A protein has these predicted regions:
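Conserved ABC transporter NBD signature motif
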Residues: 241-252
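Conserved ABC ATPase signature
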Residues: 325-329, 333
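A short, proline-enriched helix->beta-strand linker immediately N-terminal to the Walker B motif
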Residues: 344-348
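Conserved ABC ATPase "signature" region
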Residues: 71, 302-320, 429
């Protein structure tokens, strides 16, 4: 769900509980949403509850290293260098669980006993229990990551600080001078359902993406983000408007210079459901090499094999997965395969449509940091479509807000989050959850009153910050 709908659903659940007295079991990856709705929180790992307590216990005084890792993975706790802190490694297979504490192999604070014996539930207080040998009276005293306590104190009751370090003047100058890679001018994508009914999925949208830039598109479900991306990638032919790629207009029909073929190889897409995006009957090797063979991008077999091994290393995958099928991989591994497949094509632009929505918090952090590392190394442009506004704030340089098929606001990400001007943007940002139970319960959604028309003009408030009026 998008942020505003999610906030309304949570408020509805709380209202129903207040009126009827029902109990609610709320299962979620979203730690901000959990902070808003839950009285008690149970944290599970490898099929077992490893920590349980009141929301305040778990968020303000976490005791299990896995809980530390989950909270540290959130963008709100990104360090001064603008880096997330994902938990290393992958969850274990429940078909062959490891002995002792299942989290030990991923736990930097693991003790020798963690690899041998499963820890019991230790009592922290009357309401708080955690299954970690660190709570045994004989264990060495290891402090939780200080960043958790420091950042919670920083953000409680105040506006969040920027999640990533301010760019240097040199970086800003270089970005401004970067040439435009792709541009949409008055782009329209209409779908005629029947003779008297047409859906205006994208309606008069204009923006540009520079080389090496990360741009995000946000907005409610059905606002036209994905349709815009697919039209930009050439999956749909635009109903109206123009697309320019590297300064040349992309032809609607006849294509004597092969512009569309060039775009098909240089623009790659990564989808939300990595399972559906990978053919279940093919091996990972076949899946990754298929687009290269179709496009004949790399014809030398030895060069292709070397490039494949390089990509596996860059995306953190082992060569042993090449013989496996997608169903044998975890969600995070499948998404890494999808990223690797796109990188094999040596793209100029990657369009990622909700690429982390179905992943848990720590794996989300791993994938986002992988995106960031690869983008900095290879300098491809990146269009990031997401509902998770905290990740958008962390990752993107520029953000566009869409509503009913139109762009209503476009600005550098830092400026948009600190000074939103359009009422819809203000409503959307007010729905961002923070992992702080006491503060999250005080916050209220700014309701957006739908006008008869979103307006046809643009007002430039400052350099690169425009709002629809």
């Amino acid at each position: 769900m998008d942020a505003t709908v999610e906030a309304r659903i949570l408020d509805l659940l709380l209202e129903l509980r207040e009126k009827t007295g029902i109990s609610i079991v709320f299962i979620s990856h979203d730690l901000g949403a959990v902070a808003r709705i839950a009285d008690r929180v149970a944290v599970m790992y490898a099929g077992k509850i490893i920590e349980i307590g009141t929301a305040e216990d778990v968020y303000y005084d976490p005791r299990h290293p896995y809980t530390w890792g989950l909270l540290s993975s959130l963008p709100v706790f990104a360090g001064e260098k603008g880096e997330l802190n994902p938990i290393p490694g992958m969850p274990p297979s429940l078909l062959d669980p490891p002995p002792g504490d299942a989290f030990a192999v991923r736990n930097p604070q693991a003790l020798a006993i963690d690899y041998e014996q499963t820890p019991p539930m230790f009592k922290v207080s009357d309401t708080h229990y955690a299954a970690t040998w660190l709570l045994d009276e004989r264990a060495p005293k290891i402090e939780k990551p200080s960043i958790l306590k420091e950042r919670l104190q920083e953000n409680s009751g105040r506006k969040q600080k920027p999640d990533k370090k301010e760019m240097s003047f040199l970086q800003k100058t270089e970005q401004k001078q970067a040439p435009v890679l792709i541009e949409a001018r008055n782009l329209k994508q209409h779908f005629r359902i029947r003779s008297d009914y047409t859906i205006h999925a994208v309606d008069d949208v204009s923006f540009r993406i520079r080389e090496g830039e990360i741009m995000a598109l946000v907005g409610e479900t059905g606002c036209g983000k994905s349709t815009t991306a697919r039209t930009l990638a050439g999956i749909y032919r635009p109903t109206g408007g123009e697309i320019f790629y590297q300064g040349a207009r992309v032809p609607d029909k006849k294509d004597p210079f092969g512009m569309r073929k060039k775009m098909q190889t240089e623009i790659q897409m990564i989808f939300q459901d990595s399972g559906a995006a990978l053919n279940p009957r093919m091996s990972i090797r076949q899946i990754m090499l298929e687009p290269v063979k179709i496009s004949r991008r790399i014809r030398d077999r030895e060069m292709l094999e070397n490039r494949l091994r390089e990509i596996l290393k860059e995306t953190g995958l082992d060569e042993s997965i090449l013989a496996k099928k997608p169903g044998e991989l975890s969600g995070g591994q499948r998404q890494r395969v999808a990223i690797g497949r796109s990188l094999l094509m040596e793209p100029r632009l990657i369009i990622a449509d909700e690429p982390i929505a179905s992943l848990d918090i720590s794996i989300q952090a791993q994938i986002v940091m992988l995106f960031k590392k690869l983008q900095q190394e290879k300098r491809f442009s990146f269009l990031f479509i997401a509902h998770d506004l905290s990740m958008v704030r962390f990752l993107s340089d520029t953000t566009g807000v869409m509503k009913n098929g139109k762009l209503v606001e476009m600005a550098p990400t830092k400026e948009l989050f600190e000074n939103p001007q359009h009422p819809y943007t203000q409503s959307l940002l007010s729905a961002i959850h923070i992992p702080d139970p006491l503060e999250e319960r005080k916050r209220r959604l700014i309701e957006y009153e739908e006008p008869q028309s979103l307006g046809e003009g643009w007002k430039e408030l400052s350099a690169c910050h425009c709002v629809r009026i």
